Regions:
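Bacterial Sec-dependent N-terminal signal peptides
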Residues: 1-23
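Gram-negative (and chloroplast) outer-membrane scaffold detector with strong preference
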Residues: 68-145, 153-161, 193-197
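Internal, hydrophobic beta-strand segments that form the core of beta-sheet-rich folds
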Residues: 164-166
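Outer-membrane beta-barrel domain signature
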Residues: 39-41, 58-63, 95-99, 134-140, ...
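Solvent-exposed loop and beta-edge segments used for protein-protein assembly and interaction
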Residues: 42-44, 64, 100-102, 115-117, ...
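Hydrophobic secondary-structure block in the mid-to-C-terminal portion of proteins
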Residues: 169-197
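Short glycine/proline- and aromatic-enriched beta-strand/turn motifs that initiate or cap beta-hairpins
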Residues: 20-78, 83, 134, 188-197
């Protein structure tokens, strides 16, 4: 009797193990799957940009030579593809008289940045003010408009490196001396490092 009871108990336990496993691997309504996809940037992501550029004057003839510029900027993504930020640049161009035209543009920027894998293609428009100085004339606030296009490679989650070109329009309007009114058009090409956080 004990043996029969033991065999029946063993069969019941074995049958419960066999029926406990789902052999057809079908999804049930209780199964939960999370779609994980990599996005290079999301709302709230930020980056700091550091740039060294050559500055090429476009409308001064031979009066203004090729110069240089350095730029630092802070940008924050408001969506996966769009960022708002602020850039400060220091630029200079020598003149034919061995003098120096210097300018410090400060711009608010909007950037649209599509990407493919680790390659990023930012398109930026900026508007702001510039402090401009030549000989004994200082001009502030001078309007500045700029457009930028770049190509970057994201080498790590926190760093991207690339090249960027910038077209800059800087007018000078004088109320008292209309004969001094002028504008500058500059094209730049630069090497850029960006730290993402």
């Amino acid at each position: 009797m004990k043996r029969l009871f033991s065999i029946i108990l063993l069969l019941l336990v074995s049958i419960s193990f066999l029926t406990a496993q789902n052999t057809d691997n079908e999804e049930t309504p209780d199964d939960y799957y999370e779609d994980i996809s990599y996005k290079a940037n999301g709302a709230g992501d930020q980056y700091i940009k550091i740039a060294l550029m050559g500055m090429f004057p476009l409308n001064f003839g031979d009066k203004l030579s090729t110069g240089g510029a350095a730029e630092i900027g802070y940008h924050r993504f408001v969506s996966e593809y769009f960022a708002l930020g602020f850039d400060v640049q220091f630029g200079y161009n020598p003149t034919i008289g061995s003098n120096m035209f210097t300018y410090v543009p400060m711009t608010f920027t909007g950037t649209f940045q599509p990407y493919i894998g680790n390659f990023e293609f930012p398109l930026t428009f900026g508007i702001g003010a510039a402090l401009e100085s030549y000989l004994n004339r200082n001009y502030f606030p001078g309007l500045i408009l700029k457009g930028q296009a770049g190509f970057f490679y994201r080498v790590a989650e926190s760093w991207s490196f690339g090249v960027e070109s910038e077209y800059m329009y800087m007018p000078q309007w004088y109320a008292d001396h209309k004969e001094w009114n002028d504008y500058g058009l500059f094209l730049s090409a630069g090497l850029i490092a960006r730290y993402h956080f």
